[in-house]
Regions:
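C-terminal hydrophobic helical "lid"/dimerization subdomain
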Residues: 1, 237, 281-328
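NAD(P)H dinucleotide-binding glycine-rich loop of Rossmann-like/cofactor-binding domains
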Residues: 89-169
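Helix-to-beta-strand junctions that scaffold the AdoMet/dcAdoMet cofactor pocket
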Residues: 243-245
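N-terminal Rossmann-fold NAD(P) dinucleotide-binding loop
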Residues: 175-176
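Adenosine-nucleotide cofactor-binding segment
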Residues: 165-171, 183-238
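Short N-terminal strand-loop motif that marks the start
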Residues: 1-64, 124, 210, 327-328
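Rossmann-fold NAD(P)-binding glycine/threonine-rich loop
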Residues: 254-269, 282-287
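Glycine-rich beta-strand-centered segment in the early N-terminal region that forms part
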Residues: 21-35, 48-94, 128, 133-139
Length: 328
């Protein structure tokens, strides 16, 4: 089968022919239909996330089951499925026992120590798969397994109250979904975007207002929750000034630079800084349900699998608007 392979740290993606895998215990073989390229793929390619090379990345994989292991009874051939970052865990550590599998130190993760979705076929652990609603196209479903899951988890983890105001910082691959989720959930939603050329589109996504920075957000009345999808620690720091008392900054973007925050600001306004990822399988179900009901739509660029290196470079250069999807 054809696959996009990262042969070594910081190397270019290469299309290679590799053996098609066969399902082992508790696994299903999935004929891939779409696989999203996330900016985390860049971090993995550069070796920022530990793991062995060569690698086949892709942690937004969706497709159709074409074979199952004999012990699998919950899934069948023909099912439309996807899987998220964490597929399997040890089941014995403290975090597994507490139901927080995403913290298991022995987890098996899609595209990290398990083959990812940037290939014609992929193995998935059956009990880690989610059924995709029949009315959701594969290209729309794929980004929800990371981008959508992540931003909806962040909003849920912040536990907004009905009267609270939500700001989304950074309108890109995650941010354009965060605006839609916040609005679909019924919250007054403000977007923080440095790009005036995006303003019309951002309002069409559901934003009630668009501001340029933290100062602009403060002038507009501030926010109770900021969903920060930017990759700039400096911008995150700037936005904190606009949080209202008891405000929450939810960080979903990554930057190697430290976050410079005044403890006095946190103390006086009782501000919380929350790191958030894919927090609960229930949130993935909810994130997909919004898409199935037509309340959230991903803006995607699609590329055939053979053009994976080109699509990856679009993501590296920040030119993809807003999610790059490989189709098979």
């Amino acid at each position: 089968m054809q696959a996009a392979v990262v042969p070594a740290r910081s190397s270019s993606w290469q299309m290679k022919d590799i053996p098609q895998p066969q399902p082992g215990p508790n696994q299903v073989l999935v004929k891939m239909h779409a696989s999203g390229i996330c900016y985390t793929d860049v971090h993995e390619t550069l070796g920022h996330i530990p793991g062995e090379f060569p690698r086949i990345l892709g942690h937004e994989p969706v497709g159709e089951i074409v074979a199952t292991a004999p012990d699998v009874s919950s899934r069948k051939v023909g099912d439309r499925v996807g899987t998220a970052w964490v597929q399997a865990t040890c089941g014995r550590c403290e975090w597994c026992q507490r139901g927080r599998r995403n913290f298991c130190p022995y987890q098996k993760s899609t595209g990290l120590n398990l083959q990812g979705g940037h290939a014609e076929y992929m193995l998935m652990y059956a009990d880690s798969t989610f059924l995709i609603p029949d009315n959701v196209p594969y290209e729309q479903a794929a980004p929800i397994f990371c981008a959508g899951y992540t931003v909806w988890s962040g909003l849920r983890w912040a536990a907004p109250k009905p009267h609270e105001r939500v700001a989304v910082h950074g309108i890109g691959g995650l941010g354009h979904l965060a605006v839609q989720y916040a609005k679909a959930a019924g919250f007054d939603t403000i977007a923080i975007s440095h790009s005036p050329d995006k303003d019309k589109m951002i309002r069409e996504l559901g934003a009630d207002e668009v501001v340029r920075d933290g100062k602009g957000l403060a002038a507009a009345g501030g926010a109770d929750i900021i969903l920060s999808t930017t990759n700039s620690s400096k911008s995150m720091t700037d936005s904190i000034q606009a949080l209202r008392p008891d405000g929450r900054l939810v960080i979903m973007g990554a930057d190697a630079e430290p976050l410079a925050v005044s403890p006095m600001d946190l103390l006086i306004k009782r501000i919380r800084i929350i790191g958030s990822q894919q927090n609960d399988p229930e949130y993935l179900f909810e994130a997909l349900d919004f898409v199935a009901k037509g309340k959230v739509k991903t803006i995607v660029e699609t590329y055939p699998l053979a053009e994976a290196p080109k699509a990856y470079q679009r993501v590296v250069d920040g030119k993809a608007r807003f999610r790059a999807i490989l189709t098979m």
